[in-house]
Amino acid sequence: MNRFWNTKKFSLTNADGLCATLNEISQNDEVLVVQPSVLPVLNSLLTFQDLTQSTPVRKITLLDDQLSDDLPSALGSVPQMDLIFLIDVRTSLRLPPQLLDAAQKHNLSSLHIIYCRWKPSFQNTLEDTEQWQKDGFDLNSKKTHFPNVIESQLKELSNEYTLYPWDLLPFPQIDENVLLTHSLYNMENVNMYYPNLRSLQSATESILVDDMVNSLQSLIFETNSIITNVVSIGNLSKRCSHLLKKRIDEHQTENDLFIKGTLYGERTNCGLEMDLIILERNTDPITPLLTQLTYAGILDDLYEFNSGIKIKEKDMNFNYKEDKIWNDLKFLNFGSIGPQLNKLAKELQTQYDTRHKAESVHEIKEFVDSLGSLQQRQAFLKNHTTLSSDVLKVVETEEYGSFNKILELELEILMGNTLNNDIEDIILELQYQYEVDQKKILRLICLLSLCKNSLREKDYEYLRTFMIDSWGIEKCFQLESLAELGFFTSKTGKTDLHITTSKSTRLQKEYRYISQWFNTVPIEDEHAADKITNENDDFSEATFAYSGVVPLTMRLVQMLYDRSILFHNYSSQQPFILSREPRVSQTEDLIEQLYGDSHAIEESIWVPGTITKKINASIKSNNRRSIDGSNGTFHAAEDIALVVFLGGVTMGEIAIMKHLQKILGKKGINKRFIIIADGLINGTRIMNSIS
């Protein structure tokens, strides 16, 4: 079992796989036609120079509506160029219409199509190969290996085609402990968790779960890992864990079973642990509607990161492996960015000043050797100084919508201390006095509805009438979709919704009760997000990512290991205070209060039962140590905990989970949280998808 996940290698594995496939297809020069949704991911893995040096690719063009017009010029300049299509249909389950159109219009004699799929396990591939041989298939024919749902669409063409899989692993783009599968949105930019059409939700959820299971399975087999403890929160999360367990069991070999029995047998126990925690977005629909206050979060709210972790309107590359300044600043509260940039500028100036002290040839050589890295660091520092200044200008302008007033209103809604009439007056003020964008107004109204566990009938009708009168009758369709998804409901509508969507996990309590039980709005740290701190200062509570609020998602994960919050705020009758393994015992009543279903949370153990007697030892006696191979130093051994988000994760939640890891570490629970999510989410994306 591997407990050291080198996630940085996943990027290299993906890049090498694509290059090998492109070299396999042809030795002629190639034109790579890339589906637009795939391009940002491709750019994260390879530069154009890397691609042209390692493969026969000489040109790249987009698989868009202009392709049919651009093809003659792309192919005509160089003789004998092969056309290679790169597509991803894992969520849409259909070929891009532009590919079919180009093939028919230009009568392409042979189609070479590379399609994305999650990397299968070696065992699975071996078993499939043996079965194909038994069934008499030609192993050199790629056509028989392709999913039927896509192959049937290709058969409509008279063109010959050859299909090549690009086996992928989720890879780090934001942080080495954050892996995004980019399956939350399909190629039409439909949100698979919150589809605009309610009738599609069952189908899109199934696709989303299947894709996440495939990605998790690829990671588990690639790293040779064994999952020991699993906790699922939410009905969709339980579906995901059940399906993953089934597929892992189906593809286990006798060798796998022998290894697991040796490590976790009746008489022996290796003590290694790997947790899997799965949460779906509806377990906490409130956090994405809040304004984010970390550097990365506020950039996502203002400019929106794409799947290549680049933002609109700004020509910047946020590469955490190259840009150390971005890596240091991304999860800090924005209020501390200025002092940090000032500190980094002084350190850089000090390093430049060492050239005046260089006297010997050796000292001069050392400075010259470091000059390249200093200049690169200076460029990064300049970029982030300019960007943070731009952000500051935007949030300080009234045209943006009174940034501080929105933060204050969010906190008032969460604390439940303000009457609905007062909140409605503030919303009207934001609309007419500050001319706030309607998506932000709608986000605040949805936040109010969720925190009140739906609105009184008269408040609902008042706000609904206000929005229709202000924004037009066509807004009715979006409000209907928001109601069906539980974002904007009346007390009566909430009851009807609960009857028709009994399988969905939804909050059933007003947020003021939730905040009391989980202490999500700590009074002592109410204004912590406004404090100016440096990188050595830690917030005692995780209120730095949002305005005085701790996300419910963090508290749900925290209670699995640390019951101190529930002990002080919900019930003093807790089975433990600290636990190395995630445990849900005696949370059933709390979960039923939250979601109306005590079975919305589920715990399971995927190794022999004796492990619970061995692993659940006192935290104080947990003196496990591991060695860092890079420098030979020892440090506390960390158990890997895979935290999976179905339906998207916010930049703020990522920062909060890293904070929780530190909190648990100080208490002797050494975990390495690796976040795996199907995509990034925030209030703007939700409002855009439900339109």
From Swiss-Prot:
Q: What else is known?
A: Present with 830 molecules/cell in log phase SD medium.
Matches recorded under Gene3D superfamilies: 1.25.40.850, 3.40.50.1910, Syntaxin Binding Protein 1, Chain A, domain 2 (3.90.830.10)
Q: What is its main location?
A: other
For this record, the Gene Ontology CC terms, alphabetical, are: CORVET complex; cytosol; early endosome membrane; fungal-type vacuole; fungal-type vacuole membrane; HOPS complex
Tell me where on the tree of life, at the top rank, the source sits. Eukaryota
Give the Pfam families listed for this entry. Answer: Sec1
Q: How does it assemble?
A: Component of the HOPS complex which is composed of PEP5, VPS16, PEP3, VPS33, VPS39 and VPS41. HOPS associates with phosphoinositides and the PX domain of VAM7. Interacts with IVY1 and VAM7.
Species this protein is from: Saccharomyces cerevisiae (strain ATCC 204508 / S288c)
Q: What is the protein name given in its UniProt record?
A: Vacuolar protein sorting-associated protein 33
The GO molecular function terms of this record are: ATP binding
Spell out the family assignment given in the record's similarity comment. Belongs to the STXBP/unc-18/SEC1 family.
Q: Where is the signal peptide?
A: none
